[in-house]
Amino acid sequence: RDYYASRGLGDVYKRQVENEQEEAEKLMNELMAYAATFKREKVNAKELIIGMKCGGSDGLSGITANPTVGLFSDMLVSKGGTTILTEVPEMFGAETILMNRCANKELFEKTVHLINDFKEYFIKNGQEIYENPSPGNKDGGITTLEDKSLGCTQKSGSSLVKGVLAYAEPVNTKGLNLLSAPGNDLVAATACAASGAQMVLFTTGRGTPFASPVPTVKIATNSRLAGNKGNWIDFNAGRIVTDDLPLEDAAKELFQLVLDVASGKKVKAEIAGFHDLAIFKQGVTL
């Protein structure tokens, strides 16, 4: 950001040059040359900031993939790292679990506001607060919103909540953070990236090829999905059921995969050249 400001890149968009495209290309080439001087170096795992998201959940989400991510989160936090849990509407019905783990009264009150503000957002726009789970969730075996939310919150593990963030607010506290964003997969994952996540762990039982602006590790809740969509899925948590893989071992494998991706290994979406982003928009679009 400092380099961006020092080179006056914003001037291009203020129309202070005659040919915006030519000037922008010139400055971007300078920026690329500057970026090329960076060299990969070893850093401690405590420098990692990992977003956690689920989508297309099924009956195994709360049994395999989400608990695996939760245990991963605890492992990373114990090493001084940072995780981000978002998709606030998916917390409805299980929010007290997170509230009871807030590190102090201020964070507790922020978490209460986080939940209630999103409910007010639903009401303001005439939407049913509890219009969940989706038809796909029900087909996959989820019965109620509480069922879905209890699965969602498992991604947070058992660590104390150390931060509560507004939408796209940068992370400034290590440990488990809660982030205000909707349940929409791409909007929520993009919000994690905007808040500083270098990677997003995305659990799914129904399957989706989506990917966010940062490496998106897609974790299957069941082995059938992992087998059918091997070009989408990076990690098969379904082995906890089909192969009696201990949860702790699954979390350790996932932790190693995260380290590998942070070290340059490409996830399936990157290999396919697929990524996208979506900004959370409120109000009327004209």
Residue ranges of model-derived segments:
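Short N-terminal secondary-structure initiator segments
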Residues: R1, E18-F38, E169-D185
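Single conserved hydrophobic/aromatic residue that forms the stacking wall/gate
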Residues: D2-Y13
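Short, flexible, glycine/charge-rich loop motifs used to bind or transfer phosphoryl groups or to couple energy/partner
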Residues: D2-Y3, K39-E41, T190
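A generic structural motif
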Residues: D11-Q16, E87
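Glycine-rich, mobile lid/loop segments that gate access to catalytic sites or pores
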Residues: R15-G59, T64-A65
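Anaerobic metallocofactor- and corrinoid-dependent redox/one-carbon enzyme cores
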Residues: E47, M52, D58-L286
